[in-house]
Amino acid sequence: MKWWEKEPLRIIEIFDCFDLKRLSPEEIARAVKKLGGNSQHFHCMQHSTKIYGSGLDDRSLYFNTSAGSVQNPDRLTEYIPYAKKYKIKIIVYFNVHWFTIDFGKRHPDWVQIKQDGQPMDNVYGTGTSFCINSPYREWVFQILKDLCKYEINGIFYDGPIFFSNTCYCNTCQKLFRDKTGENLPQKSDRNHPLWKNFIEFQAESMEKFLEESNNIIKGINPELLFYMNGNSNWPYWPTGRDNHRIIKHTDILGAEGGFIYGDLNQTPIFKPAIAGKLLSSQANNKPTVIFDCADHKPWSWYVLPEAEISLLLCETCFSGSNYWFAVCPDDINQPEMKAISRFGNFIKKYPDAFYKTESLSNVALVWPTKSAESYTGSSVPRTDFTSIIEGEEIGNLHMEFDGFYEALSRIYIPFDVIDENNFDFLDRYKLIVLPNTACLSLNDCEKIKKFVFSGGNIVGSFETSLYDEAGKIREDFGLSDVMGIQFNGNIFGKMEYDYVSPVKNIKSRYLKDIKKILFPAPDYGISVKTTTGNTEIFFCKRMKGRYDGIPEVSNDPMMVVNKYGKGTSIYLAGSFGKTIANFRFIEYFTILKNICDWLSSQYVFVEDNKNVEIFLRKKGDSIFLYLINMTNGLKRPIKFLQTLYNVKLKLKETKPVRLFALKSETYLKHKKTRDGIEFVVPELNNFEIIKILTGGEK
């Protein structure tokens, strides 16, 4: 077992790469320890100087290497004794995506070229980037060889990356021409017949670069950790970073799920957990890490409130991932840092709750990776590597996914996030949620059909399965027989003041507690007719204005229930998740809760509508119930969490159990009920973890 697999990783980065003299080596080691870290990203390469400019430069390497054009003091050798003294694992941070303009001018054949023929010159507004297909790769490999001579524990690549308008360097053009016999297409022209070839070429280039990097490192020292900054729930076409390829040649799968930007009210509070859950499903049983940042991006020297930092940590670790936290030198002693140190030391005290646990969820929400690459409703979010690229408003993938994610969380459903690569293992779940999973291959559809026919259940919305994996529209849904519908040929909307209406006088388990005869429609709908399915909610006829008389029920189905073999399909003929994300209509939450109540089995029940998010995982005979307090102010950034008292929970557990609250360090009393047990958490501040002991473990 490798060192990074033996305990939860608590990775701290002291962000001193802009001034390596800011802190002494021992001050850095003490800071990492103070913040609860057991490992760190260590900087021995300076990223900005007044002389050389912004970005990495071959004159700014502070360790012994033949790749440097200047011999600087050996900071790495100086630091190693302090890392040993404070028992910290050293992971060298290696920036492989941002370089000084001057460095690029000295190596013009290394520079990434934009589709307009100009060199890349605005990385973070100030620097350039080099191409991994160019001779630059040999410079990187030499640095790896030199770093591996030191007593370090790992190497982290920040990058590598392509950009949404690169790369057209001579090397890339030659390699693509040799491979296809064609010239590189415009990357911005997603309808070009060679566009997908270009995207796959870049993803393959990334994979080959990582494979060779890993071979160099492991060939020198098999005990060295190697990983990079990967992808989360966004497309890989702009960057070439395909997680399924990345994890083949790295030891950990990581992504910037905890970098939060701009107006935080527009950012899902669940962002780190989305990344953590998704990466866990993509990592092939290897560890995952979510990169969390203490600053409020893009203000990199402005720290977030303590409550926001606490939520980043909880969302990251309760999803089953390790954390990495970046802290600026000036912020080490700020009061907000107590959240990091307390959490890190809590993990150190109770590692089992954070180490090699397994999800107990029987509900899975699909992140549609094929749609993210090929569907017109797919957008690119703002990250440290990408600018916002808007998809079409109709069928917006991110909002559809985020809406379902939020709803499942708000109704207390523990769930996983998976992608199409997990469809071989659907039998571990009872309910699969497909949020506008538009682009599916025939093979994907067959796996879903088999799952439902054998007794599994699905919820699908809008254009789910209407396109093949390449984004080409089908004549009918690939899952038409499962969903009991046929495509009528058109999409309607935008509906800004229109309605849907439940069918009257039917006793439907899925409409329980829906009292209104009208409630708002999704902003876009799709025209279908039922075959074997039964309509339980109809769209109303479109109105010319919001006061255009009393809404009349149409013949267009909005919710169709269909039995298929032993399983059930619920089809929602509109942008259901997007409407939740935008408006949070109570009826939408109620419908989804009813579906989960009947088509999945739940172990945990939260009483009294407390604003709590739950995660459920197991290890051996122990079950861990993670509670996050979501009771806060109406706007972000969140400055405080309102303490909850007497949070009442029920467990569908018939075995004798003991309940131990890790954070409050107390055993909880419980009483038996007809179908399980119930107990009370007396006080919930930011979080609590309940260890449910069902065996002889203490």
Language model segments and positions:
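Carbohydrate-binding surfaces of carbohydrate-active enzymes
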Residues: K6-P8, W195, E200-S232, Y236-W237, ...
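Short, acidic/polar
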Residues: F18-K34, S134-L147, Y236-R245, P305-L313, ...
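An active-site-proximal structural segment forming one wall of the substrate-binding cleft
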Residues: T128-F163, I216, F346-K349, A353
